[in-house]
């Protein structure tokens, strides 16, 4: 029997002032099934319970782009890159719910990108493409540097590393959205210094509680206000070994 994702229409409405269409709900369900299938061969996610998947992969992905869902974020057809997308989060749910955007999913693992290519075909997501590569290299590539309106990244290490990965890819005025669990004031101070070096400012840091498990999460929003100096991002491995 197929595991069914919860619909959660009321919670979507209460928390994000948004609800998925019937088609989007069907896409969420199919995405869930495809990830469960892919998990047998690839280590995509340990989150497989339907409610947990809904909260930690779908709801969390869309909470970060709340300004986009509400239509308050120009331009009307944004170009978005999801850095280190892994199993496709947050990029794939964003592609489903912001159909006027174009999304690039970046990951350094070929097997994950091959899996995502199959998902995009299955879900008929024509607004989305994939790249195998590292953020340090892509950020120095003329086709990608200063090419995006929005950069998404789930922070697993130092947030200053996320800033170094995202800001070089953004156009002037672009927005980096960093998805994060815990957050401290010391991190804000450290991040301010790094962001200034990279041509950005911290626009806001939002704390929120997830609707089912009531976990504390944060989204850090960085605005690109000046050109990133040419030496950033530094070569592969350097940002993580020597965070700004």
From Swiss-Prot:
Superkingdom of the organism of origin: Bacteria
Keyword S-adenosyl-L-methionine found: yes
InterPro entries in UniProt: rRNA_ssu_MeTfrase_G, SAM-dependent_MTases_sf
Pfam families listed in its UniProt record: GidB (PF02527)
EC number: 2.1.1.-
Subcellular location: Cytoplasm
SUPFAM superfamilies: S-adenosyl-L-methionine-dependent methyltransferases
Protein's job: Specifically methylates the N7 position of a guanine in 16S rRNA.
Protein name as catalogued: Ribosomal RNA small subunit methyltransferase G
Organism of provenance: Nostoc punctiforme (strain ATCC 29133 / PCC 73102)
């Amino acid at each position: 029997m197929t595991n069914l994702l919860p619909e959660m229409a009321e919670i979507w409405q209460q928390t994000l002032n948004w609800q998925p269409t019937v088609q989007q709900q069907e896409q969420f369900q199919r995405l869930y099934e495809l990830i469960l299938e892919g998990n047998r061969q690839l280590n995509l996610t340990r989150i497989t319970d339907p409610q947990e998947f809904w909260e930690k992969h779908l709801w969390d992905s869309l909470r970060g782009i709340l300004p986009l869902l509400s239509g308050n974020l120009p331009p009307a057809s944004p170009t978005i890159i999801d850095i280190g997308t892994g199993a496709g989060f947050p990029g794939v749910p964003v592609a489903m719910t912001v159909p006027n955007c174009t999304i690039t999913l970046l990951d350094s693992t070929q097997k994950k990108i091959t899996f995502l290519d199959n998902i995009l075909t299955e879900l008929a997501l024509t607004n989305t493409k994939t790249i195998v590569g590292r953020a340090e290299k892509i950020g120095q590539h003329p086709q990608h540097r200063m090419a995006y309106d929005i950069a998404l990244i789930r922070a697993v290490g130092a947030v200053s590393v996320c800033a170094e990965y995202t800001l070089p890819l953004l156009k002037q005025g672009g927005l980096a959205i960093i998805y994060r669990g815990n957050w401290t004031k010391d991190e804000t101070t450290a991040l301010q210094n790094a962001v200034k070096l990279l041509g950005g400012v911290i626009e806001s840091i939002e704390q929120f509680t997830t609707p089912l498990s009531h976990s504390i999460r944060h989204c850090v929003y960085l605005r690109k206000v000046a050109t990133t100096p040419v030496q950033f991002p530094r070569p592969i491995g350097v940002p993580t070994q020597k965070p700004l």
